[in-house]
């Protein structure tokens, strides 16, 4: 009888210890979850289906756009544009590929939502452990669902994230999982929080930044401050290809920032997020963000980063349509490139 008592007592003790350990683990998990949600709640939220503009507002927008026009090129009619073949499958509509659209706004005083000045698709492929940054040129001529044909950046001004996502899906067959928007002025603050960004500068680039920010940079590798990185990202008049070089510089800065972040420890990363997230606007829920983070974090430090742009060299022509200077992409070639670089 005594032996049975001891065995029973031992079982109870083991059970108590096991339950205590389990309680500690569950409490820790709950604490992490609560902390994570508290961190995510620092972001600004917007409904993906932001209000669209009225017909009158759109007409005023188009008229203002024509008045600002300074480009040139052979004139063609809207009916001459070849929109390519039918799209059968969506790129990124799988568990191994996550497509997050990064939207940069250069909002002017009094504006609540401007044209998207920068659109960079961040594609994370868990299977190949790659991150691809794809810039979409703002003068790209596309079909905008419900609004006709215009520059791609107009879709954001007219219908926010949802319309921009629908535009990318209809024209390029890309499935967007979520959107992240940063105002360019906030972008400078983010760079400063990361301690600056390393960038190789040409002599003329350094001179431009110096003039723009009252700095004293020289050619070669430099650690740029937030204002200097923003100035660098906006350069478009030093090269013959203007806006193409500008988007290339933006991808360079973003790639360098990714490299800095992925080399940071968890404690440092959490500290950065605490400071950065209040500067970010998204249409994703906390659950969606944490779900994507759980998928990406294990491979993030080992991921290789590459970049590209749409349209690519040799896959577009610069023309005038209805008084607008636009880029008309070879849709079939462009979709083929995206299939090769973004598909799992």
Predicted regions and their residues:
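Non-catalytic, solvent-exposed segments at the cell envelope interface
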Residues: 2-20, 28-344
């Amino acid at each position: 009888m005594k032996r049975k008592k001891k065995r029973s007592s031992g079982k109870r003790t083991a059970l108590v210890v096991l339950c205590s350990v389990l309680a500690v683990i569950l409490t820790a998990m709950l604490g992490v979850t609560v902390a994570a949600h508290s961190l995510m709640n620092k972001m600004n939220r917007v409904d993906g289906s932001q209000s669209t503009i009225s017909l009158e507002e759109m007409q005023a927008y188009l008229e203002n756009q024509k008045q600002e026009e300074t480009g040139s090129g052979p004139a063609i009619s809207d009916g001459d544009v070849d929109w390519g073949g039918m799209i059968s499958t969506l790129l990124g509509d799988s568990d191994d590929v996550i497509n997050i659209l990064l939207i940069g706004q250069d909002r002017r005083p009094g504006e609540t939502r401007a044209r998207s000045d920068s659109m960079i698709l961040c594609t994370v492929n868990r299977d190949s452990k790659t991150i691809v940054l794809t810039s979409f040129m703002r003068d790209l001529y596309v079909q905008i669902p419900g609004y006709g044909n215009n520059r791609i950046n107009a879709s954001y001004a007219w219908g926010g994230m949802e319309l921009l996502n629908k535009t990318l899906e209809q024209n390029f067959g890309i499935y967007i999982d979520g959107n992240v928007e940063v105002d360019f002025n906030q972008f400078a603050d983010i760079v400063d929080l990361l301690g600056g960004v390393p960038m190789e500068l040409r002599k003329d680039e350094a001179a431009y930044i110096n003039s723009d920010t009252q700095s004293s940079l020289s050619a070669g590798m430099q650690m740029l401050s937030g204002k200097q990185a923003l100035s660098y990202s906006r350069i478009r008049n030093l090269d013959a290809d203007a806006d193409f070089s500008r988007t290339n510089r933006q991808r360079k800065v973003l790639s360098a920032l990714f490299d800095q972040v992925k080399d940071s420890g968890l404690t440092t990363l959490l500290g950065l997020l605490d400071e950065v997230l209040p500067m970010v606007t998204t249409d994703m829920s906390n659950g969606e963000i944490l779900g994507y983070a759980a998928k990406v974090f294990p491979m993030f430090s080992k991921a290789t980063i590459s970049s590209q742009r749409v349209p690519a060299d040799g896959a577009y022509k610069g023309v005038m349509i209805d008084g607008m200077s636009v880029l008309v992409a070879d849709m079939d070639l462009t979709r083929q490139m995206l299939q090769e670089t973004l598909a799992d």
